[in-house]
Every structure is written in structure tokens, then in C-alpha cells.
């Protein structure tokens, strides 16, 4: 059953950004929510293909990147790894397992403003702050 409040948020964000509300964008957002984890575009494509025959990987990337820009999903860029898309758009942090590559959510209050301020003092233009802890997950320890 589609999450109508999630659909409403996406619809409002698309319209506010001057974008069309399409069935494809709604389905891809729903699929990301249903996967409930940090998914690659390839995983989203695989899960969405039965509902959207003929869907292509470039289209999935473009749509997921748009969702991230609109603030209804998050894009997580890893060093040398495929981007992951997070259905949780609200601020939170991540833990990346260095053994299996799994990415987990970490709910903690961190003063990201202080991190951004320190970077700006160093002459850096900060667009956002993402904190990722690295180590071994419980399954790999």
C-alpha cells in the first residue's frame, strides 16, 4: 500500500521545485521507501522494473538524484563505491563496515555546525555535512 503522506511530500517538493509529478518518480520513491535500506541505483532498478517495464539505469540515477536534491531522499557518496540512496531524508549519520561494505544509520546528535564552521575558517565552501563512522559491523567483528 503506498504511503500517501510520503507521496504528498514528494508531490509538494516536485511542484515547489518546478518539476513534473510523474508516475515514474512516485514509483521510484515508493520503491526506495519499500527497500528501507541504503540502496544503489541498480538495486532500485531491479526492484522497480516489474512496475515500470523498460526503465533504464540512467533514468533511475537521474530520478534518485532529483529526489536527493529535493530533500525527500539522501545520496551517500562513498570513496570508490557506487552511490547509495537513503530513504531517510531527515538528518542522521552513518556507519560503514570496512569488511562487508554495509552502511547503517547512526542516530546521534553531533554539532555539525561546528564542523562546517571549522572548514569555512580554512577557506572551504561547505555545501553540507555528512558524518560517516567506519569500522566493523556486528556481523563482521
Regions found by a protein language model. Name each.
Residues 60-70:
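Basic amphipathic alpha-helical segments that dock to polyanions
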Residues 21, 34-40:
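Short capping segments at the starts of secondary-structure elements
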Residues 69-141:
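Non-DNA-binding regulatory cores of transcription-related proteins
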Residues 7, 24-25:
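Short, leucine-enriched amphipathic alpha-helices that occur as contiguous helical runs
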Residues 26-31:
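Pre-recognition alpha-helix immediately N-terminal to the DNA-recognition helix
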Residues 43-49:
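A short acidic, leucine-rich amphipathic alpha-helix
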Residues 4-18:
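Short, Lys/Arg-enriched N-terminal segment that forms or immediately precedes the first helix
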Amino acid at each position: 500500500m503506498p504511503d500517501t503522506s510520503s507521496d504528498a511530500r514528494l508531490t509538494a517538493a516536485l511542484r515547489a521545485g518546478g518539476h513534473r509529478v510523474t508516475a515514474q518518480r512516485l514509483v521510484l520513491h515508493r520503491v526506495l521507501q519499500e527497500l528501507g535500506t541504503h540502496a544503489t541505483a541498480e538495486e532500485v532498478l531491479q526492484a522497480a522494473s516489474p512496475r515500470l517495464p523498460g526503465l533504464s539505469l540512467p533514468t533511475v540515477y537521474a530520478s534518485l538524484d532529483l529526489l536527493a536534491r529535493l530533500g525527500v531522499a539522501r545520496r551517500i557518496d562513498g570513496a570508490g563505491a557506487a552511490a547509495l540512496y537513503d530513504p531517510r531524508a531527515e538528518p542522521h549519520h552513518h556507519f560503514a563496515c570496512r569488511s562487508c561494505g554495509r552502511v547503517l544509520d547512526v542516530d546521534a546528535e553531533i554539532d555539525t555546525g561546528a564542523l562546517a564552521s571549522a572548514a569555512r575558517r580554512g577557506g572551504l565552501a561547505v555545501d553540507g555535512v555528512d558524518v560517516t563512522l567506519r569500522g566493523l559491523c556486528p556481523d563482521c567483528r
